[in-house]
Amino acid sequence: MLREENDRLKGQITTNSIAKEQLQQLLQLVGIPFVGDTPVVHTRVVSGTLGNFGDRLELDKGSSSGIERNMPVVTGEGLIGKVVEVAENRCIVSLLSSGTFKVGFSVVGTAAIGIAQGNGGENSLRGANIDSRQAVSVGAITATSGLAGSPFPPNLPIGTVTAVRTNEAALESTVDITMFANLNDLVYADVVLWKPAG
């Protein structure tokens, strides 16, 4: 009898812990400062983020909520991907960690810009095409560059530089970036209703 009560209490603690984590994710989406006045659609993840997952997830909102292809998707921590397919009440998101996903980024506080690409399912990216004359250091913060033609607005947080490699002959540096957003077990995400000008 005591063992059954102990097991029941352990189950309740686990359930409460999961609920607390989901609440924390939801609270992070309230008033995300880096999207400014751009409207967002709050969504719930309906498939694709259980543990070590692939490179896509499905959200419970679609075109009826104003969502269109190529719109950025964020959590309270930063950019996680972009919308690649849209139905009336669902959309599919390609995650930033995907090996096929590319995003223009800038290193905050410097003039350094580059292109980051996912490593295929990890919470890390590889940044390339950085002018080696620009000083980039480990610990530097990266965000979307928002340069002309970019599918992303400027200043969406991406992650932190964890390694820098310089090829002096090519005048180019590459960096490793660890994403701010944890892509494991996502429950909520916001679609930023933003489209590039033109």
Functional labels for PLM-detected ranges:
Residues 14-18, 24-198:
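A secondary-structure micro-motif
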